[in-house]
Amino acid sequence: ASLLTTAPAIEVAGTASSGEVEPVVVSLADGLWIGVGSDHTDRELETVGVTLSKQLCAKPVAPQLWRYAEVEDHWDRLVLRSHAIQGGKRRLYQEGPVAALRPPRELMSRYRPGTDILPPGSVMFCGTLAVMGGIAAAERFEIELEDPVLQRRLRHGYDIAPLPIEG
């Protein structure tokens, strides 16, 4: 949880990191909520170890959430989307239905066998979609979860500030 941020910018080590849009389940005392986040990852370190590469970067999330109960019956119709901005050019980076991912209740039951809910205070990133045109670093990353049934969107964007790697 210490890596989660709604900040408009993150700092990363070097220039070899990139975002990937994911639905995010947030378990609070009043139930399950859905958000959208970026599992920002150091791609060079990923060749050494996935877990290590994921722990190195902040995890930007949109500051708004939807009640899971509001979308559970039409979950497969939700759409994930991300854009990468590099050199001032915005390009579609990922797009597709969340139906391509495992449903949140299945993921939660895999995490906690015998139940399909997370303990309050827990957050779970729920998987990502393939990248269009290859993984690439960017100066800004924008994420979105669209609900075409209720005609609404969760959005967040963040700038990526690379820090020099010395030594």
Where are the model-predicted features located?
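Catalytic-core "active-site belt" of small-molecule-metabolizing enzymes
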Residues: 1-119, 123, 130-167
